[in-house]
Amino acid sequence: MFIDTSELCDLYAEQVDVVEPIFSSFGGVSHFYGKVTTVKCFESNGLIAEVLEENGEGRVLVIDGGGAVRRGLIDAELAQLAVDNGWEGIIVYGAVRQIQQLENLDIGIHALAPIPVSADESSAGESDIPVNFGGVTFFPEDYIYADLTGIILSQEPLDLED
């Protein structure tokens, strides 16, 4: 279903938080939404891989990588895993790699920047905890909506038929 974050902001101005415009789109899908699942990690993506093994239908993975852009937390292999398991999208407060492959996958991916260096594969980090970046706090079970214009967050699902 097509979403327009500008229209959603107009309709639900009092209900949504707007993430600061620091992200770029790298995936093959320009707009996506779903229930938030969080991971907090630093320059490692083992825990991300574990979470992406889960059924992602109706879910968006929000990764707090501390804003670090020295290593790509998502690469083509992890993005394909997300597609295979039905994830709607991935938001990375950090870097991604293998951009040419990411843009051909059927998933939305927003991140700070691309870099060719891979993350380490340790499972260090935490999941399903509140994370804060971009001027908002993301709680597991919140709802996130993203397109090329921006990213918004709501505690309740928004009626996309309005």
From Swiss-Prot:
Keywords: Cytoplasm. GO terms for molecular function: endoribonuclease inhibitor activity; enzyme binding. One of its GO terms (biological process) is regulation of RNA metabolic process. InterPro entries: RraA, RraA/RraA-like, RraA/RraA-like_sf, RraA_gpbac. It is found in: Cytoplasm. Its main location: cytoplasm. GO terms for cellular component: cytoplasm. It comes from the Bacteria. The keyword Transcription does not apply. It holds the Pfam family RraA-like. Globally modulates RNA abundance by binding to RNase E (Rne) and regulating its endonucleolytic activity. Can modulate Rne action in a substrate-dependent manner by altering the composition of the degradosome. Modulates RNA-binding and helicase activities of the degradosome. Homotrimer. Binds to both RNA-binding sites in the C-terminal region of Rne and to RhlB. Belongs to the RraA family. NCBIfam families: NOT-MenG, PRK09372.1, RraA_entero. This is Regulator of ribonuclease activity A. It comes from Haemophilus influenzae (strain 86-028NP). The gene is rraA.
